A protein has these predicted regions:
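N-terminal positioning helix adjacent to the helix-turn-helix/winged-helix DNA-binding module
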Residues: 2-7, 39-42, 67
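Minor-groove-contacting beta-hairpin "wing" of winged helix-turn-helix DNA-binding domains
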Residues: 63-71
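A short, conserved structural fragment
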Residues: 51-61
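Short acidic, hydrophobic short linear motifs in intrinsically disordered regions
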Residues: 18-30, 34
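Short amphipathic alpha-helical interaction segments
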Residues: 35-53
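Short alpha-helical segments that sit at the start of domains
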Residues: 1-19
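Short, amphipathic alpha-helical interaction segments positioned at domain boundaries
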Residues: 71-88
Length: 88
């Protein structure tokens, strides 16, 4: 699976929870489902790509300027279409 698919596999089963790019990168690295470690910056770029496709959405907390990401209904459908793989 590629990074985008794994991000969806991480977020979809945890809906409606939201996570930072750093938290997502840490969890993906801990899962060892990628062939190499990913950085928070790589995850942030992938999240922006997924956002453009309507598969994730972001929410910026205006008090502390932290961006969190969550799955959209379209993202959940894509996750189901791909076999509902879950990142634990």
């Amino acid at each position: 699976m590629n990074l985008n698919q794994l991000i969806i596999a991480f977020l979809a089963p945890r809906d409606p929870a939201a996570y930072t790019d750093t938290a997502i990168a840490q969890r993906l690295n801990a899962s060892r489902m990628l062939d190499r470690r990913c950085t928070a910056d790589e995850v942030a770029i992938a999240l922006c790509d997924l956002h453009k496709l309507g598969l994730v959405r972001m929410n910026v907390n205006k008090l502390d300027d932290i961006t969190v990401w969550m799955i959209t209904p379209d993202g959940a459908r894509e996750w189901a279409r791909c076999g509902r793989v879950t990142v634990v």
